Amino acid sequence: MLKRDFLKTSLLTVVGAVLSPAVLAAAHEEKLLREARATPMADGPFTLPALPYPNNALEPHIDARTMEIHHDAHHKTYVSKLNEAVTGKPEEKMSLAQLLASASKQPDAIRNNAGGHWNHSFFWQLMAPKGGGQPAGALAAAITKDFGSFDKFKEEFTKAATGRFGSGWAWLIHDPKAGKLAITSTPNQDNPLMDIAGIQRGTPILGLDVWEHAYYLKYQNKRPDYVAAFWNVVNWSEAGKRYDASLKG
């Protein structure tokens, strides 16, 4: 190979590596984190909850950098924009639950950011450093009754998570009217607590964020690998408490 061709090939290899989707995505996420840290939280009724564990607590299944960016940049931004959206309006005096229940009547800025805030606050609680395994008690019995077995439930939930087109969430919900568990998914930051047409409503018991920012740094575009890893950190104790509370109304 001529020296000129060798240099050209080497240069293209380097440029290709630098401009790879994974590298570009990582740079974008780092930029979001820097901007979020440099921007004060907008004043308002809503606050960013702390993670219930260190950033690295879910390693190796969910990496520390993803957790840091996901919480400190993405979740913070939802809270800040929600405060901006409700300030000076009647919605400023409404609870997060009330905003979700009236989402069909809210402008996109409130609907999307209220959903983003609630969904992420829920998501952090439904994972744990020593998670995984299987549920116990009433939730375990309900899963077996409504899905046939834990393995069949897991398969159906995985299909909902991997099959959700674009950004969104997969959910295990308790439908109090039907008196049973169900699996569903929602687009963007919508959730089953919203009065939105086309959304299967119910009490969330388990939720999984399938937006790319939740997994791209570690898993790139391999969403199925991320979903498989999620089962190792599920906080079944918390999910069981949510189910028990839903039964009581």
Could you say what each language-model-derived stretch is?
Residues 22-58:
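C-terminal segment of N-terminal export signals and the immediately downstream linker at the start
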Residues 45-77:
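Mature N-terminal segment immediately following signal peptide/propeptide cleavage
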Residues 61, 72-73, 83-93, 98-174, ...:
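All-alpha RGS (Regulator of G-protein Signaling) helical domain and cognate RGS-like helical scaffolds
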Residues 159-162, 167-220, 228-234:
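An amphipathic alpha-helical core segment
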Residues 222-249:
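N-terminal targeting pre-sequences for secretion and organelle import
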Residues 16-20:
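Hydrophobic h-region of N-terminal signal peptides that target proteins for export
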Residues 1-14:
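N-terminal secretory signal peptides and thylakoid transit peptides that target proteins
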Residues 48, 75, 117, 172, ...:
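Divalent metal-coordination and catalytic microenvironments
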